[in-house]
Amino acid sequence: EKEILDNQIYTYYHGLISPEQLIKEYDNSSIALHVESFDLKNSLITRLSFSTKITDCLQSGAAVMAICPEINAGFKYLLEEDAAICISNLDELETTLRNIFNEPEILTDYALKARECIIKNHNPLKNKEMIADDFHKYAQ
């Protein structure tokens, strides 16, 4: 399996890398990939969780591709926000990759959508203000 992931032509397997190195790798990437398990047990366990890796991918500057079961909360979020190329059926993977190969502007479009999503929904100052407003509203 590692040979498939690390063919040194199209894909590179880095193993464990530091957060600083991850940023450098994202800078050199066309796609930031977020993958969740399709195993039923793991899918059910993680279906309500929102991985911090999603935010990392959205901030990467690359187009985001999410390959996850459709019951996953993070996948639903990315799909609703149209912030990522979303694949919930592994049978769609090859067709999606061929579409990207034939229309590379898809990656530019989704990199922009990821950036717009980060600005709209993941601004720490804006989120802090919203939380403070909620506390004030419910404290009265």
What is the predicted function of each stretch?
Residues 45, 59-61, 71-88, 113:
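Acidic, glycine-centered active-site loop in nucleotide-sugar glycosyltransferases
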Residues 5-6, 26-27, 58-59, 79, ...:
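Alpha-helix boundary recognition
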Residues 51, 69, 80-91, 99-105:
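Conserved acidic donor-binding segment of nucleotide-sugar-dependent glycosyltransferases
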Residues 138-140:
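The C-terminal output helix
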Residues 1-28:
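Nucleotide-activated donor-binding/catalytic signature segment of Leloir-type glycosyltransferases, i.e.
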Residues 88-91, 95, 105-136:
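A charged, aromatic-enriched C-terminal amphipathic alpha-helix characteristic of glycosyltransferases
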Residues 18-27, 32-55, 64-76:
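Nucleotide-sugar-dependent
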Residues 11, 64, 84:
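Hydrophobic anchor at the start of a short beta-strand
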